Amino acid sequence: MLRIAVTGIPGIGKSTVVAKAAEKLADQPGFKIGGIQTAEIRKEGQREGFSIMDLATGKTGVLGSIRESGPRVGKYHVNLEDLEKIGANALRSAMDCDLIVIDEVGTMELKSEAFVSAVKVVLESDKPVLAVLHRSSSHQLVQRMRREFEVLVVNEKNRDGLPGKIANRFREMR
C-alpha cells in the first residue's frame, strides 16, 4: 500500500501539489478519491482563514478564521464544529475509496481529538493515502506518519513536477 506525505515551508504549495495530483487521478475511470482538502480564504488580498472540503461530497466549511471563536492557532481560531462534522466524517467515510487525501495534518487540525482519531482509523486501514504534513510538528501522530510514509519535501524547484510524479506512483499501484 502506497502512502505519500508532502511537507515544506508555509506557502510553498503543498496543498496545491496534492490537489493537482488528486485531479490527475480523478480523471481515471472508476478511481474514487475521498478525504479532505483545505484552501485559503482571502478577502481583498488578505488571508482571513482556511476552508475545509469533503472531497467525496463537496461539502465545505470553515476550518479556521480570524472571525471564529474556538482554540487559537496564531491569529486564527479553529472551528472545531466544521473540522469534526466535515473533516473527521470525510475521513471515516472514505474507506471505500481508492485513495484517501488528508490535507492537512497540521496545528489547526490537531486541535480536534475527533480528527486525530479519524486519521488514526485511516492509518490502521490498508488504504493508499496522500497527505500534507506540518513541516515541524512534534505531535505524536505527525511523527508516526513521518515514519510510516514516504515523505517528499516541496520546494520551488520540484513543486511543478511533483503532482505528475505522485499521480503516476498511485496509478502504478493499481
Swiss-Prot record:
Gene3D superfamilies: P-loop containing nucleotide triphosphate hydrolases (3.40.50.300). One of its GO terms (molecular function) is ribonucleoside triphosphate phosphatase activity. ATP binds at residues 8-15, 99-106. Coiled coil: none annotated. Keywords: ATP-binding, Hydrolase, Nucleotide-binding. It is an enzyme of class 3 (hydrolase). It catalyses: a ribonucleoside 5'-triphosphate + H2O = a ribonucleoside 5'-diphosphate + phosphate + H(+). Its EC number is 3.6.1.15. It holds the Pfam family NTPase_1. Belongs to the THEP1 NTPase family. PANTHER family: CANCER-RELATED NUCLEOSIDE-TRIPHOSPHATASE. Has nucleotide phosphatase activity towards ATP, GTP, CTP, TTP and UTP. May hydrolyze nucleoside diphosphates with lower efficiency. This is Nucleoside-triphosphatase THEP1. It comes from Methanosarcina barkeri (strain Fusaro / DSM 804). The lineage of its organism: Archaea, Methanobacteriati, Methanobacteriota, Stenosarchaea group, Methanomicrobia.
